[in-house]
UniProtKB/Swiss-Prot annotation:
It comes from Nocardioides sp. (strain ATCC BAA-499 / JS614). ATP binds at S353. A motif ('KMSKS' region) lies at residues 350-354. HAMAP family: Met_tRNA_synth_type1 (MF_00098). This is Methionine--tRNA ligase. GO terms for molecular function: ATP binding; metal ion binding; methionine-tRNA ligase activity. Is required not only for elongation of protein synthesis but also for the initiation of all mRNA translation through initiator tRNA(fMet) aminoacylation. InterPro entries: Anticodon_Met, Met-tRNA_ligase_1, Met-tRNA_synth, Methionyl/Leucyl_tRNA_Synth, MetRS_core, MetRS_Zn, Rossmann-like_a/b/a_fold, tRNAsynth_Ia_anticodon-bd. Monomer. One of its GO terms (cellular component) is cytosol. Binds 1 zinc ion per subunit.
């Protein structure tokens, strides 16, 4: 057994999240975490709402709310949506908690005392019309390195290099198109060059494992070539105060939102332990060098997870060129793997809330089963390359693969048992074909589990559905509905099929947890083999306002292995597991999108 940290990207709370977001970080992390729990590992899955930064200020102004009011509203919406999708967070929290602020300031002080912050005069971008600071990501222009027209003020997505806004050629505000003014300002810069050698050694070690996706390791190594200090404070009044005399009193100096957001993985772990009244338990995942940690995100956040966050951890632990010693948290573990997904587009277009090219999670789940979307992400999502969500493909996969494949197998198995026996029948003498099928399905535990553990979820769901097809073929070949005068043989066939369905239900449960409980119930079980998260209203541990979290009791996961079915277990006629979709919804959804 290993301790496994599933560190899931923090959704930004300037609005509800769309399906492109959860396809990148949400579903893949939950499939992995569910499997790892079933495989016997001690999993801690954490995340939360990222609530600081200028985009929150802008969205709050547009909504006529304070930044805190906007964050409160959107955090609740996001938490409800993620829970409805069945994501099994041990803790989904937020960055405006007092706990998070304290942990971020502790990390800052550790990095500062070890000498990895340098104070520099730089240029800040100001909107001439509003006088408000423009964040790096709200400025775009031409990249001075590759010439790409559309580079952001913090990095160029075309060549991957880090940038500063005043480096851009012809910079302009993404808010109103005006040319920003640049004024001198003081900031703390993370001394990345002093951490470059340690970062490089860590990345080389990760590459040697052969586990990282090639695009992630290559990108991470390439950005080291142009490494330079990066500002970790901002001229803004919404965020976490800089915990130094002369700085904390300044209402317009705050820590960079990306400095604080990635620390959320640690602060959420600490909050989780505190809520258990075991305040040091988080250390089992962060200080134990044998613990494993997997970070899930979209590819636009690789830089922050394979450079900025590891650099912060190395600096706090005193592992860079300047040395140093850690403060109260001790030496902190570096990521075992950065699991980055590519982008999901929709009907050939980039998701864009402003252009209304968007399907919000809440809207999708109000009309369709969550497992239908989870299945689409696993089978056709952006695991290794960009993929496109189309309504026609969503309908096809739901109807042809879930309804006609897995759902049909479950329904006809339970119907045949209910009609002929009313309970799980005993198995008589097995034929070679019976035993071969049982052995083949049992082997899928090893094949599918290995693929999920190596973040090959598309292959994993493919192998599981191949086994479903194999069992469906066995049923068609043996034609149990035609057996009228040999109850022993009929019972044996249905026992074999029921065992295979029970096995496949466990194998598919990380992908299809809602259906897993229905299938278990159809075979006479309790319908509780796939634990679900819950929303809970809690008090801030340090005296702040109450807020909702996602948490859950996940000790009830079954083992990742065959569980022999029990003859005599009552089986009733089931209801369909999946809802067949009318092809007309394609035009309806496209019309809804255009309107």
């Amino acid at each position: 057994m290993s301790r496994v940290l599933s560190a899931v990207a923090w959704p930004y709370a300037n609005g509800p999240r769309h399906i492109g977001h959860v396809a990148g970080f949400g579903v893949p992390s939950d499939v992995f975490s569910r499997y790892m729990r079933m495989a016997g590992h001690d999993v801690l899955m954490v995340s939360g709402s990222d609530e600081h930064g200028t985009p929150i200020l802008i969205a709050a102004d547009e909504a006529g709310l304070s930044p805190q009011e906007l964050a409160d509203r959107n955090h609740r919406i996001i938490a409800e949506d993620l829970a409805s999708l069945g994501l099994t967070y041990d803790l989904y929290t937020r960055t405006t908690t007092r706990n998070h602020h304290a942990v971020v300031q502790e990390l800052f002080l550790g990095v500062y005392e070890n000498g990895y912050f340098v104070e520099q005069t730089t240029y800040g971008a100001i909107s001439p019309s509003t006088g408000r600071t423009l964040p790096d990501r709200y400025i775009e222009g031409t990249c001075p390195i590759c010439g790409y027209d559309g580079a952001r003020g913090d990095q160029c997505d075309n060549c991957g290099n880090q940038l500063d806004p005043h480096d851009l050629i012809d910079p302009r505000s993404k808010i109103n198109g005006e040319t920003p003014e640049f004024i001198e300002t003081q900031h703390f810069f993370l001394d990345l060059p002093a951490l470059a050698e340690a970062l490089g050694e860590w990345l080389d070690g990760r590459e040697a494992t052969g586990l990282w996706r090639p695009n992630v390791i290559r990108f991470s190594q390439n950005i080291l070539k142009e490494i330079r200090p990066r500002a970790m404070t901002r001229d803004i009044d919404w965020g976490i105060a800089v915990p130094l005399d002369g700085w904390r009193e300044n209402p317009t100096k705050r820590l960079y939102v990306w400095f604080d957001a990635v620390i959320g993985y640690l602060s959420a772990s600490i909050e989780w332990a505190r809520r258990l009244d075991e305040p040091d338990r988080w250390r089992d995942w962060w200080n134990d060098p044998d613990a494993l940690s997997y970070y899930f995100m979209g590819k636009d956040n690789i830089t922050f997870h394979s450079q900025i966050w590891p650099a912060e951890l190395l600096a706090y632990s005193g592992k860079g060129a300047k040395g140093g010693t850690p403060r109260q948290y001790g030496e902190l573990n570096l990521p075992t793997e950065v699991v980055s997904s590519e982008f999901l587009t929709m009907e050939g277009r980039k998701f864009s809330s402003s252009k209304r090219v968007v399907i919000y999670v809440r809207d999708l789940l109000s009309r369709y089963q969550p497992d239908a979307f989870r299945y689409f992400v696993a089978a056709a999502g952006p695991e290794n390359q960009d993929s496109d969500f189309t309504w026609s493909e969503f309908v096809r996969r739901t109807n042809d693969e879930l309804v006609a494949g897995w759902g049909n197998l479950v329904n006809r198995t339970a119907n045949l048992i209910a009609k002929n026996f009313g309970e799980i029948p005993k198995a008589g003498e097995l034929t070679a074909a019976d035993q071969a099928l049982l052995d083949s399905v049992a082997s899928a535990f090893g094949v599918v589990g290995d693929l999920i553990g190596r973040h090959r979820q598309k292959q994993a769901i493919g192998e599981a559905m191949r086994a479903v097809a194999e069992v469906n073929k066995y049923v068609s070949d043996t034609e149990p509905w035609k057996i009228k005068d040999d109850p022993d043989r009929l019972g044996t066939i249905l026992h074999v099929v029921a065992q295979c369905v029970a096995d496949l239900n466990l194998i598919l449960s990380p992908f299809l947890p809602f259906a897993a409980n229905e299938v278990d119930r159809a075979l006479g079980g309790s319908g509780e083999i796939a634990p679900m998260p819950r929303l809970e209203e809690v008090d801030d541990l340090d005296g702040g306002a109450p807020y909702p979290i996602i948490t859950g009791e996940y000790s009830g996961f079954p083992a990742w292995e065959r569980r022999p079915i029990v003859p005599g277990t009552p089986v009733s006629k089931p209801t369909p597991i999946f809802t067949k979709l009318d092809p007309s919804i394609v035009d309806e959804e496209l019309a809804r999108l255009e309107s």
